[in-house]
Design a protein with these regions (language model features):
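Conserved catalytic-core segment of nucleotide-activated headgroup transferases in glycan assembly
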Residues: 196-290, 473, 477
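Donor nucleotide-sugar binding/catalytic pocket of nucleotide-sugar-dependent glycosyltransferases
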Residues: 147-207, 217
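N-terminal pre-catalytic "stem/leader" segment of glycosyltransferase-like enzymes
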Residues: 1-93
């Protein structure tokens, strides 16, 4: 199987890969699982971490250091700060592929455009696709200078359809407005989220008995939900409560619903509890702390079935569904977003039909764009227009309760499917195959090309070209001011005159040498060449020359000084 011909650069931030103490999000669970799997199964010896600042990488260093794979493999972690992106990813990038924990970012495509050439490829994956920011990132794929060798990983076919719908709508607008034939500029690849099938495995007889005893469960049929308690951003609980209550009435069997989750506020948590009492009086509902990893891990052992009746456009995949399959549990899920890719209806679980009323959300996107509603209210408004077939859900639950053998058979089929299709070793192999394809496509491009024209934020010397009295060039004659070398040290020591110093040379001996070369009037181009001979890049060299002129260490040579 092909693999990238060098290290990948991972855009790293704790928010994308580390589970927080509070406010846990599905994307963080998925990000942490990906990182663990890439450490365990990736065929690499060096990893580049692209970070906002070096202090943001300490957790990654710890994760790499403590990971079991580090005991048997010598690996190198290289850290690159984003503030040095143009320099480090210029002539000889430390990596030929940059992977983001979300859709690839336009700023990196624009940076590549400014650098010129095809020095690296960009890759990223989808999570939520409903927010203003997410929609903006998708539109950027159409108008930013992305290349055909860049890639967006869609976690399901429904997600890919959403991406195409957003991009196609925007392309139609651009075509109507400007003409031409705007098209999506990146490659779309469908790769699902993965699951650790060693950690997420069926409970032993002993584990099941112990956990059910711990929870005081007898012969009840236990339906488990794992995830955020969010009626607008995850799953409204009413369809589940109502369906289970109807199933209890139909079968006459005791049912226990276990909600292993966490809520954004005590008000939301209480609303879920109150709803269970009101809408599922025949069902014993228990809430357990889903923020505790140990509790969240053990609670699976007590379950007979897993339920996820998602009805939010915030959802894209539903990782907990795949975890449930890996645990050998039959899944009852809505026929919604990525669920129809993960659950084989009638084989590994059952899909409950959903519907929406055309026209009910026609102005919702515009209301969000205008700020008439915030994102949470937008999700709530749209969610109120999503219908889950409660009668079908009730019939589904009743069937599993009555036919325990069928439920067990579905659970076993789900386990086999999880191992075959969603286990991390295979998913990482698919990632590496995609990255290898990207590298092949990128390296097949033509030779070096110059910096591209235009840009999201053009160079000030072009944007503000009309501001100064004149522009200096290589032929401009300059000369060191009197006592320049004597004044240099104080100017370097004073914050008022030495701020933004990272963009230029600050070494006193180098600067003194340049001033010495200008003891007599000389070409500015000669001083720039002298700086470049000291391995100073062209931008830093020009910025250094500008600083010397700004603080009267160099002056524009007059006719008198030229001897005229």
């Amino acid at each position: 199987m092909p693999s990238p011909s060098g290290p990948i650069a991972l855009i790293y931030d704790d928010d994308a890969y580390v589970e927080p103490a509070a406010g846990l999000m599905g994307r963080q669970v998925a990000g942490g699982a990906f990182l663990d799997a890439y450490l365990a199964h990736g065929r690499w010896d060096e990893l580049v971490a692209l970070v906002k600042s070096v202090d943001r990488v300490e957790s990654l260093k710890r994760i790499c250091r403590e990971h079991p794979s580090s005991r048997s493999r010598a690996r190198r972690l290289r850290v690159v700060e984003e503030s040095r992106f143009l320099e480090d990813f210029g002539d000889l990038p430390p990596s030929r592929l940059i992977h983001a924990p979300g859709p690839p970012e336009a700023k990196h495509a624009w940076a590549r455009h400014q650098i010129g050439g095809h020095g690296f490829a960009l890759c990223g994956l989808t999570h939520t696709l409903a927010s203003v920011a997410a929609i903006g990132r998708l539109r950027d794929l159409l108008i930013a200078p992305f290349q055909p060798y860049d890639a967006l990983i869609c976690t399901s076919t429904a997600v890919e359809a959403t991406v195409r719908a957003v991009v196609d709508d925007y392309a139609s607008y651009l075509k109507d407005r400007f003409g031409g034939d705007p098209r999506l500029g990146v490659h779309l690849a469908t790769i699902p989220l993965g699951v650790d099938t060693d950690r997420h495995r069926p409970a032993t007889v002993e584990e099941r008995a112990e956990q059910r005893t711990r929870m005081g469960i007898g012969e009840e049929f236990v339906v488990l939900c794992v995830g955020r308690l969010s009626h607008h951003a995850k799953a409204h609980p009413y369809p589940l409560y109502r369906a289970l209550d109807l199933a209890a009435a139909t079968t006459g069997q005791p049912i226990r619903l276990v909600m292993s989750g966490w809520a954004a506020s005590t008000g939301t948590a209480e609303a879920f509890r109150r709803g269970a009492r009101l809408f599922a009086p025949r069902v014993v509902t228990e809430f357990v702390d889903g923020t505790d990893p140990a509790v969240r891990d053990r609670v699976w052992h007590a379950a007979d079935a897993f339920a996820m009746l998602a009805d939010s456009v915030q959802e894209t995949f539903g990782l907990a569904v795949v975890e449930a399959m890996a645990r050998g549990l039959p899944v009852v899920a809505t026929d919604w977003d990525g669920h129809r890719d993960t659950v084989v209806d009638g084989e590994t679980g059952l899909l409950v039909p959903t519907a929406m009323v055309r026209g009910a959300t026609l102005d919702s996107g515009a209301r969000l764009d205008l700020g008439a509603v915030d994102y949470d209210m937008y999700l709530a408004e749209v969610g109120q227009a999503v219908i889950v077939d409660i009668a079908a859900a009730a019939s589904t639950f009743a069937g599993l309760i009555v036919e325990r053998g069928r439920a067990a058979s579905m659970g076993a089929s789900g386990r086999r499917r999880a191992v075959a299709e969603f286990a991390w070793p295979g998913i990482i192999t698919r990632y590496e195959a995609l990255w290898a394809w990207q590298e092949g496509e990128r390296s097949a491009q033509g030779g070096p090309i110059g910096p591209g024209v235009g840009g999201r934020h053009g160079p000030p010397e072009r944007v503000h070209a009309a501001y100064p009295s004149r522009w200096l060039d290589d032929e401009t004659r300059v000369v060191a001011a009197a006592s320049a070398i004597d004044r240099l040290a104080s100017l370097l020591a004073e914050p008022l005159t030495h701020h933004a110093a990272g963009r230029r040379v600050s070494d006193p001996s180098t600067l003194s040498g340049i001033l010495g070369l200008a003891a007599d009037p000389t070409r500015a181009g000669g001083l720039l060449a002298a700086l470049r001979s000291r391995s100073v890049g062209p931008v830093r060299a020009a910025a250094t020359l500008a600083w010397l002129l700004k603080y009267d260490l160099l002056r524009l040579a007059s006719v008198t000084e030229e001897g005229g």
